[in-house]
């Protein structure tokens, strides 16, 4: 089994880390530079920075903030939000990002996936998908979960893989911030049908939820925000628990 990854996520709004429930009711969760440094020191495997209102508000990700966070961590760093063209990717990689996460822009212009993969390599391109389970299956949403699209989760992630995405970051909007566990059934079907890594997001509340994401959901990595930001779960303790459950963990 490849080592599983634990990934804290900084959801950024107006330069501050925030956390909501089901994509709304945001509350402040701390200084992103300090949080990033702390997670890096505590043994997080990667860090994700999502400027959650950039696509909605139509502005560019905070390049300066990305630079400051990158200077304070020594783990792989993924940045997303408001990335619409190759010049955005170039700017953020130069600011210290290792990978770029695209979401709304890829749904509107799928060719962007091909272009990033061709120009920077598949390993740089993370397709983030915000999906909600409806009566008609899992539907993908745009602009931070504000607009439903006709794209279905499995079909869209398969297309992204074919276009050159190197990783899928799947957030279940039904589970986001609710802390009742990840969408393991959907995760497992993604893992079974894709050959690229899948990151689970949305729903972590207990250490057991991470275990289930790996063992039941077959995820390659598990991302969480509030349980880390508010000190409910500490990364070293989580890793030692997962090792005890027979899961291969980095570090």
Swiss-Prot record:
Location(s), subcellular: Cytoplasm
GO molecular function, one term: lyase activity
Catalytic activity annotation: 5-[(5-phospho-1-deoxy-D-ribulos-1-ylimino)methylamino]-1-(5-phospho-beta-D-ribosyl)imidazole-4-carboxamide + L-glutamine = D-erythro-1-(imidazol-4-yl)glycerol 3-phosphate + 5-amino-1-(5-phospho-beta-D-ribosyl)imidazole-4-carboxamide + L-glutamate + H(+)
Enzyme class: lyase
BP GO annotations: L-histidine biosynthetic process
Residue numbers annotated as active site: 11, 130
Domain of life: Bacteria
Record keyword Transmembrane helix present: no
Entry EC no(s): 4.3.2.10
Metabolic or biological pathway: Amino-acid biosynthesis; L-histidine biosynthesis; L-histidine from 5-phospho-alpha-D-ribose 1-diphosphate: step 5/9
GO terms under cellular component: cytoplasm
Family classification: Belongs to the HisA/HisF family.
Function: IGPS catalyzes the conversion of PRFAR and glutamine to IGP, AICAR and glutamate. The HisF subunit catalyzes the cyclization activity that produces IGP and AICAR from PRFAR using the ammonia provided by the HisH subunit.
Assembly with partners or alone: Heterodimer of HisH and HisF.
NCBIfam families referenced in this protein's UniProt entry, alphabetically: hisF
Entries under PANTHER family matching the protein: IMIDAZOLE GLYCEROL PHOSPHATE SYNTHASE HISHF, IMIDAZOLE GLYCEROL PHOSPHATE SYNTHASE SUBUNIT HISF/H IGP SYNTHASE SUBUNIT HISF/H
Official protein name in the record: Imidazole glycerol phosphate synthase subunit HisF
């Amino acid at each position: 089994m490849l080592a599983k990854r634990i990934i804290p996520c900084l959801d950024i709004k107006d330069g501050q880390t925030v956390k909501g429930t089901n994509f709304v009711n945001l509350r402040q969760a701390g200084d992103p530079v300090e949080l990033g440094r702390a997670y890096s020191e505590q043994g997080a495997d990667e860090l994700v920075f999502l400027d959650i209102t950039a696509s909605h508000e139509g502005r560019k990700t905070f390049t300066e903030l990305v630079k400051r966070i990158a200077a304070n961590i020594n783990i792989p760093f993924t940045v997303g939000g408001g990335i619409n063209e190759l010049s955005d990717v170039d700017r953020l990689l130069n600011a210290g990002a290792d990978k770029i996460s695209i979401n709304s822009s890829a749904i509107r212009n799928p060719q962007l996936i091909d272009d990033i993969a061709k120009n920077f390599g598949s390993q740089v391109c993370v397709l983030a998908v915000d999906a909600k389970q409806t009566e008609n299956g899992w539907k993908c949403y745009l602009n931070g979960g504000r607009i439903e699209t006709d794209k279905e989760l499995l079909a869209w992630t398969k297309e992204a893989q074919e276009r050159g995405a190197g990783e899928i970051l799947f957030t279940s909007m039904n589970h986001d911030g609710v802390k009742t566990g990840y969408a393991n059934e959907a995760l497992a079907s993604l893992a079974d049908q894709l050959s690229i890594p899948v990151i689970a997001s949305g729903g972590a509340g207990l250490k057991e939820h991470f275990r289930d994401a790996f063992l039941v959901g077959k995820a390659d990595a598990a991302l969480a925000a509030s349980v880390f930001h508010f000190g409910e779960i500490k990364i070293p303790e989580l890793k030692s628990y997962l090792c005890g459950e027979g899961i291969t963990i980095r570090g």
